[in-house]
């Protein structure tokens, strides 16, 4: 059997994960030469990707959460390599993996190493790359003291509003978004710019996004003139806020906000008053299920090893 080589770059907190240890042993029995390296601090993922490529590896496995996945995907894209990526979701949210249909069971996720890779896009902003989504709002995760009423009415945008306990605490940011044949300006409560579909642990801000269409899905949650009253009316009427989103797909979009807007790139913070988001089509080869919901195009022929 021809031996196949890969490097698993594993988040340091997963070093003692017995499921990972067993699955790695199984892959080795199947003929894989699978090296394992651990991340410890910021910058390790990029360094380890560089070491893997220098050692001749053409296949990287990202073992961790959405942040680890973003770091490794960015490093591979910046290296301008045709090395491919398998996703081993070990985080809390695993948003891109879940939306893409990647199994959460370790052994099943590693079975994708034997599936032909597909070309997927990345998003780029401010010199940073992201695989899943850029979100803007009032925080990156919902907290325990966010009231259940607020969670119910905010729906997919709930996690953007950190620590809010009353409708009266909501406030909007003024922003302007411009792209090809698209212009929107006004007050917004939340924003999602997605290559993937969900963020914050399963909240679908861009529910129909495709990772291989060369486009970014834009979801804007505009702020009604009377925020508190409108949200209360929606809640009392049994409706959520998801149907208020303005959505479009663009190859690029420029975001301007005089007071600045805090952006979260799969866990990586970014802020600015003038940001340009672009899709980088086919920037990464990723091993995904053949029926992955985020894929649209027919699979490419297998590349020779």
From Swiss-Prot:
InterPro entries: ATP-NAD_kinase_N, Diacylglycerol/lipid_kinase, Diacylglycerol_kinase_cat_dom, Lip_kinase_YegS, Lipid_Phosphate_FormReg, NAD/diacylglycerol_kinase_sf, YegS/DAGK_C. One of its GO terms (biological process) is phospholipid biosynthetic process. Keywords: ATP-binding, Cytoplasm, Kinase, Lipid biosynthesis, Lipid metabolism, Magnesium, Metal-binding, Nucleotide-binding, Phospholipid biosynthesis, Phospholipid metabolism, Transferase. Residues 1-129 form the DAGKc domain. The keyword Membrane does not apply. Its main location: cytoplasm. ATP binds at residues 39, 65-71, 92. Binds 1 Mg(2+) ion per subunit. Ca(2+) may be able to substitute. Its cofactor is Mg(2+); Ca(2+). GO terms for molecular function: ATP binding; lipid kinase activity; magnesium ion binding. One of its GO terms (cellular component) is cytoplasm. SMART domains: DAGKc. Its EC number is 2.7.1.-. The active site is at 268 (proton acceptor). Mg(2+) binds at residues 210, 213, 215. It comes from the Bacteria. It is found in: Cytoplasm. Probably phosphorylates lipids; the in vivo substrate is unknown. Belongs to the diacylglycerol/lipid kinase family. YegS lipid kinase subfamily. This is Probable lipid kinase YegS-like. It comes from Pseudomonas savastanoi pv. phaseolicola (strain 1448A / Race 6) (Pseudomonas syringae pv. phaseolicola (strain 1448A / Race 6)).
């Amino acid at each position: 059997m021809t031996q196949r080589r890969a490097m698993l770059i594993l988040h340091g907190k997963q070093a003692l994960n017995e499921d990972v240890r067993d699955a790695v042993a199984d892959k080795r029995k199947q003929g894989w030469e699978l090296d394992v390296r651990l991340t410890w601090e910021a910058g390790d993922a990029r360094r380890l990707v560089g070491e893997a490529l220098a050692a001749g590896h053409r296949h990287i496995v990202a073992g961790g959460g959405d942040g680890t996945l973003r770091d490794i995907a960015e490093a591979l894209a910046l290296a301008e390599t045709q090395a491919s990526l398998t996703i081993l979701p070990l985080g809390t949210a695993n948003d891109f993996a879940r939306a893409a249909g990647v199994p959460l069971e370790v052994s099943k996720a590693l079975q994708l190493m034997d599936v032909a890779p597909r070309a997927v896009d990345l998003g780029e902003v401010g010199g940073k790359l992201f695989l899943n989504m850029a979100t803007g709002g009032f925080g990156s995760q919902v907290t325990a003291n966010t009231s259940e009423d607020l969670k119910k009415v905010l729906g997919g945008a709930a996690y953007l509003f950190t620590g809010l306990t009353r409708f009266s605490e909501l406030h909007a940011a003024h922003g302007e978004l411009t792209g090809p044949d698209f212009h929107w300006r006004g007050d917004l409560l939340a924003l999602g710019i997605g290559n993937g579909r969900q963020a914050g642990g399963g909240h679908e801000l861009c529910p129909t996004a495709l990772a291989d269409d060369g486009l970014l899905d834009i979801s804007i949650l505009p702020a009604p003139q009377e925020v508190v009253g409108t949200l209360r009316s929606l809640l009392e009427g049994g409706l959520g806020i998801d149907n208020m989103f303005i959505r479009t797909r663009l190859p690029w979009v420029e975001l301007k906000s005089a007071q600045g807007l805090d952006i979260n790139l799969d866990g990586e913070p970014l802020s600015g008053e003038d940001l340009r988001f672009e899709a980088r089509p086919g920037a990464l080869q990723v091993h995904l299920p053949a029926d992955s919901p985020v894929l649209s195009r027919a699979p490419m022929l297998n590349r020779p090893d």
